[in-house]
Amino acid sequence: MDEYQVYLELDRSRNHDFLYPLIFREYIYGLAYGHDLNRSVFVENISYDNKSSLLIVKRLITRMYQQTYLIIFPNDSNKNPFWGYNNNFYSQIISEGFVIVVEIPFFLQFSSSLEETKIVKYYKNLRSIHSIFPLFEDKFTYLNHESDIRIPYPIHLEILVQILRYWIKDVPFLHLLRLFFYYYCNWNSLITPQKSISTFSKNNPRFFLFLFNFYVWEYESIFLFLRNKSTHLRLKSFRVLIERISFYAKVEHLVEVFAKDFSYTLSFFKDPFIHYVRYQGKSILVSKNMPLLMNKWKSYFIHLWQCHFDVWSQPRTIHIKQLSKHSFYFLGYFLNVQLNLSVVRSQMLQNSFLTEIVMKKLDTIVPIILLIRSLAKAKFCNVLGHPISKPVWADLSDFDIIDRFLWICRNFSQYYNGSSKKKSLYRIKYILRLSCIKTLSRKHKSTVRAFLKRLDSEKLLEEFFTEEEDIFSLIFSKTSSTLQRLYRGRIWYLDLLFSNDLINYS
């Protein structure tokens, strides 16, 4: 985005902050695909056999200047005999550039927000998936109740357009947004069918992600406003920067109607000890107070979704649990607060007495059953967790097979190094390693035992069987006790921006 900042500022000064003319700019499409348009080919779309080049974009912009061809119908698959591309292909390019244009005002606001709060240098660490777990360790041991919240979706698309009107003042651009909605989804339905949403998300993943993030951003902004109104203590907003599109920083600027509608209701109670965390479509709300206040927040969420977003949500979709008795699933971990009882004997002169001290500790558990199901679905093992070969990879070279298994194993190891008990993690590594050996044995048409004897001389899998302890030994001396504590304790990686698809976050 930085390399196109000059062009954006120039276009904004010429067009008085209108977004509609940006659709006719070539650099927007270069920005959409992350390449420079000076190259001959800047995108290769998996869904099509053709490649989109600078010449194609120029032809597309020329076609859009003609009013009769401004809208490219996505369902029209007739090929143009002169250009050789169907209209669906051009529609895909337009939708990618269209999303970039929509993201521009939010990106500029987000950048200025980062500069004002002076957290730019910590931006990469906050984007890490593991950045939220240190907060859990610091805060959750002092809290009592937790509520699982699954954000309802889909929302009617006209509601999204009305919300966008507060942020985008360009009327022609909003009309074009409605046209995209009309042709990609079932516009006449009050509730968008799940099949249409699925097709829409596959054909336009960036567009779908933008709409979902904007909907969540609006919902969380209202929640932040309610949270600030419910207590005299000001809430320091925690910016969630772990999503792919980071235009939705938490802001306190909301429409005045919210203050008018909710001020009377929220004056009945105060709840200063509350924390809210979200990743993708699931969020959790943790509080120190009694379940009565948690039930009040539950009621607010239900009414907010039904009245403001016209999304039906039932109360049983939000579960309230006690942290000391129940665990909850979040970001691929089972988490609960474990109570450790310690007895201390004290003696004063001739009198002695015993004191019981209860220590709370956050327990992070690897969901071994869920991971085995994911590995079985990906054909690394059966449903019982017994490793099997990967026939699809048998045609690859030995180096590519080992490299793929090694990447998955390291990714699992990094992500679940924050576990309190490493035994489940070792089992996952065992499944992947033995599956790799069986895949190589299948390729070379040999038994596992004969292939392992051959590997002893060639040392082909020496890197694959290297444990994290060897990596830590490069930093700390082996005689140091720090090495053993690091290897057995929890380790959070603040540079972990993504994980593999085998880890289920929902």
From Swiss-Prot:
Pfam families: Intron_maturas2 (PF01348), MatK_N (PF01824). It is found in: Plastid, Chloroplast. GO terms for biological process: mRNA processing; RNA splicing; tRNA processing. Keywords: Chloroplast, mRNA processing, Plastid, RNA-binding, tRNA processing. One of its GO terms (cellular component) is chloroplast. The keyword Chloroplast applies. One of its GO terms (molecular function) is RNA binding. Usually encoded in the trnK tRNA gene intron. Probably assists in splicing its own and other chloroplast group II introns. Belongs to the intron maturase 2 family. MatK subfamily. This is Maturase K. The gene is matK.
